[in-house]
Amino acid sequence: KAAEHGISIILDGVFNHCGADSKYFNKFSNYSEPGAVQQVGSAYDKWFTFHEDGTYESWWGVDALPTIVSDNPDYQEFICGENGVIRTWLRRGARGWRLDVADEISDSFIQKIRAAALAERSDAVIIGEVWEDASNKRAYGKLRQYLEGSELDGPMNYTLRKSILSFLMNEAGAESTALALEELWENYPHEAFYSCLNVFGTHDKERLINVVAGAPTPDSLSAHEQVTYRLSADQ
């Protein structure tokens, strides 16, 4: 239906970690099939890293988000195989994928994701969550290959967001802003430059109106308004 209205659906692929309550980890035994927590030798136990004290690797130490061993061959087949996650959802009508925390999945895995997507539909698009200049990004000591033709069509353009907002907030002048934008133009391949996901507000950043106009102080809001703006720790 979306395609009939000229709308393309880009799905958010989180392939570096999952929820502790997912069927794969099943920390709370909410699923009948044994997850990695319930049974050594389960279909998913090699997808995660457990320590002798019962703890496990998790995304930035958040135990609700166990880290997936994303270079595990079985996991990569689950994601990139003919009937894997990537191809199944493209087959159902999605147009592409946005890769969450691209810095934390390997170049080789991203290459497999892209290959799987293009095998399903030749016009599939792969966007990566990269917060800096994606042409020369170093992550965990390694120079990434995002824009060399076999991984991302383009990144989320947080670099553009930073430059524009710095100018609007009078934190940067016109000349330095122009130079920052020109640097992107020079660094990015032509195709990648025009395939960026340009954003000013996302679930990871402040709302644009709050940045430009200023967020209200908590004391200026009624209890009801506070709830609609930001929940307190107790709430």
Task: Report residues per predicted region.
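Residue-identity detector for glutamine
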Residues: 38-39, 76, 111, 145, ...
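Active-site-proximal helices and loops of the catalytic beta/alpha 8
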Residues: 3, 17, 26-33, 85, ...
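Substrate-binding/active-site clefts of carbohydrate-active enzymes
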Residues: 1-92, 113, 119-120, 136-137, ...
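Conserved, charged catalytic cores of large soluble enzymes
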Residues: 212-219
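Extended catalytic-interface subdomain
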Residues: 203-206
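A short, hydrophobic secondary-structure junction motif
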Residues: 44-47, 160-164, 235
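The substrate-binding groove and active-site-proximal loops of carbohydrate-active enzymes
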Residues: 1, 61-78, 94-104, 163-174, ...
